[in-house]
Amino acid sequence: MSDNMASVDEVELGDEVLDESIEDDEGLVDTGASSLSYFGADFDVSGLVRRLDQKDIVIPRFEPDEAAGLSVEGFQRQRVWTASRMEKFVESLLLGWPIPSIFLVVEPDQRYLVLDGQQRLTTLQAFHSGFFPDGKEFKLKDVAEHLQGATYATLNDESRRRLDNTFIQAIVIEPQGEEGNDSIYRLFGRLNSGGVILTPQEIRVALYRGPLINWIRDLNQDAAWRSLFGAVHRKLKDHELILRVLAMRQVVAEVDGHWDDPEKRRSAYSPPMSQFLNNFLQEHRDMKALDAAALKEAFSQSCSLVLRALGQDGLKFLGRLNAAHIDALLSVLIYLCERGKAPDDAKVRDAITQLRADKKYIDWVSRSTSHRDNVFGRLESVYTALTSQ
């Protein structure tokens, strides 16, 4: 995915998104024994490139990029290294300088998924091919004098062998059991090996790639949703919010009519939020238990209701996009729309206006937003506001 991993800042780019659950989760994550094993392995550059070409090493990507030949089930991350940085990396190998390890995850089909080291590996593959991903010739320029102007094809035999025979250390991780992917998620939340920050959703999209992730990507293009959220978010915050809405809609369905039942509440939602979202993706990865057509229609209808009721600022709370408010409002609306109980525009407008002035609700969407009581507090408040006579 990239050459670095760190926790997401609570305020994202573009329209600001307040997501207090990120900080809140830090005190809630189970730090017990992880469900994974790992070992070190050394791969020569030639072998890495061969495995990449044969797709035995998978570089996850978010949007199809057939020209680059690196698309795997819909995931693509923007190429974040400049041409100059790619050239410097190749130069480092040719000069025999040490480079950081890469991190690989063993997939069920025995392929390797790259979770740290994407840019290094794509650079090696590009240099071997002779072309940058944009189609321009990969020729070394701002490098040591004796390497200037060189391509892989024009390297002398000694330099070519030095490059291809260079060993790159890999940490190979094997998930163990049902908790394996969640352990990997937590592990990469602690990595910080380069200069590109990975967000939680970028990790999820790689670890849980498949029909549900691809379907959420399609929902992210809904016209009303785009009007409410704004420009497509380069770090997938819009994608993550849709996931949260879908997961919370399942919670609403489980507790409707039993809001005060502690057993129902414990069964429907357990913090931290990050693990709750991971579990939802794991459970519904293949979408077999979800009615995609009905959910898509309800999602679009819900976004359109908010847009008609309050315009493009309909999802904003106290002047900002607020993740906790969005997951509560849209999840309840989707649940009601699915059951043919959609409120009219005026009701939606009045409900949101009421919620924006409710001191308890403001607290539930602003503090400790991953905690169970606050999750159910905001969900029930929205449900009551939208269904009361």
Which positions does each model-derived feature cover?
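A C-terminal-region feature
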Residues: 2-4, 35, 39, 385-388
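Sequence-level preference for short, compositionally simple segments enriched
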Residues: 56-59
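C-terminal subdomains that position terminal phosphate/3'-OH groups for nucleotidyl transfer/ligation
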Residues: 242-389
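Intrinsically disordered, low-structural-confidence terminal and linker regions
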Residues: 1-26
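C-terminal active-site subregion of NodB/CE4 polysaccharide deacetylases
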Residues: 66
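Basic- and aromatic-enriched surface patches that contact anionic nucleotides/nucleic acids
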Residues: 13, 26-54, 75-271, 345, ...
